[in-house]
Amino acid sequence: MFLAVKEIRHEKLRYGLIIGMIVLIGYLMFMLMGMMLGLANENTAAIDSWDAKSVVLNKNSNISLSQSLIAKQDLPELNDHQALVGQTPAVIERAKGATDKQTIQFVGLDSSQFIYQKKMKLSSGHKPHGKNQVVLDEGLKSKGYRLGDQITLNGSTQKYRVVGFAKDAKLNIASIVYSSLTTWQTLKGTGDQFAASGIFSDQKQTVKNKNLKQYSIGTFIDKLPGYAAQNMTFEFMIAFLMVISLIVITVFLYILTMQKIPNYAVLRAQGIPAAYLIGATIGQAVILMVSGTLDALLLMIVSKAAMPSSVPMLINWPLTGILSLALVVLGVAGSLLPVRMISRIDPLDAMR
């Protein structure tokens, strides 16, 4: 390790450029992972906050909550671990003083069931009581919405009062507006014929009705529009960047080792064992990768702090730690190719 540090200090520019490349690759990887997790969270934040384990939908809905309608006659007897959810896309706008419109996901809940009672977490205000009160995603505050505002839904003349703002109220990358199932029936135009879009539960559910089907939450989330494709795209991009980092560190160390072969031959002729030189090369790779990865992490933290709240980015430290370790391991693995060259150096080359 002494030789590795000595060399890096002596060739600051060369090794600085290598670290710079590692920083850029690592930074891009961390940012991509943060954005992937941020987008994934905006797809599923509400569902995650409900702590649901299963959902019952209409069997013909193609595992889509917005396409599912559960008729009243098909509704099973519900227990304390189940909650009806009515969901439909909608457009909201303030009743006075503004013309801007926001596309949202309207979610109707039964006030006697567990999602409304225990899982709706508010950052301000209170839960909706009655069909003309709504709770908005707290992200809509940045759009100018405030407690006490009156809003309209889908251009109707009916006004709804904003009585609260909820945390983690995102579904399909859209803000949620919570209210009653009665309001959902009005927006959906179903009348009293249909009870809800789905039945969520924090346990596994048993379905006996032939018109309904139960799904795990994992299966349901994977079927959210664009969710799986979006995550797979980011995962492939991160994987390609890891391969690129492996190639970059291998090429740089290979070239540097080739340039140092005459020096290594002299050291071998002086009795320095090949194992010591190999250890120095691997030590260099460790120092370069750890330094570059730490700098990339610092850069990511600074970028996250400077980003506007509208940019979906989430730092998951356990996953970030795993990715950092993988980056370091790949870089060290890339140093094994130059190691083969060192092991083949002939001390007699220094005497020729």
Predicted regions, residues:
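N-terminal Sec/SRP start-transfer signal
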Residues: 1-29, 352
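Short helix-to-coil transition segments within interhelical loops
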Residues: 8, 267-275, 345
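Alpha-helical transmembrane segments
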Residues: 27-53
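Membrane-proximal extracellular/periplasmic loop immediately following the first transmembrane helix
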Residues: 45-110
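Hydrophobic secondary-structure segments that place a key small or acidic residue at a functional site
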Residues: 102-112, 117-182
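Mechanotransmission and gating elements of multispan inner-membrane complexes involved in transport
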Residues: 156-159, 165-241
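Peri-transmembrane interface segments
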Residues: 208-262, 266-267, 278-282, 286-287
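Short helix-loop junctions at transmembrane helix boundaries
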Residues: 279-280, 284-352
